[in-house]
Amino acid sequence: MQGMRFERCDSAAPVTLPSHATILSGLFPPRHGVRDNGTFVLSPAVTTVAELLSQAGYDTAAVVSAIVLARRHGLDQGFRLYDDDLGAGVSAGSAVEERQAEATTTAALAALAGMRPPFFLWVHYYDPHEEYRPPSRFADAASGPHRLYDGEIAYMDSEIGRLLAALPAATVV
């Protein structure tokens, strides 16, 4: 499996919902109309990559890990399955309701098991966000002033690795 490394990445907005509306629509916030987290909803008139792929015969599924991307905000357009059920994997003490990376990966693997090729599976991880609370094995492996943040990154990286290992060999990532 091959990947791509980006040495610079800019976001369309400094908050989650408008940034992800841009990722899925290819439009900047002034065009798609989602300008902040909370009450904004992506208009059904905006076409998403999931809608285009679904129309082209792809099976589509999404697994998201934060309440700010709940289906009520319209990002579910074009997805046959949109798993925004944070369920038992919700991180205690977090400022935002979020599903931790391990639970997100487990949900993504369940979605993947029910998909037929060709498929588009979009998996959203909310780690790392404050409060930084990585599992102790990741926090203990890091050091320095950014130990908890680095532990969150290592934890998420481990879970993405678990997901990638389960993908069929010819999968384009």
Language model: regions and residue ranges:
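Catalytic domains that recognize anionic headgroups
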Residues: 1-173
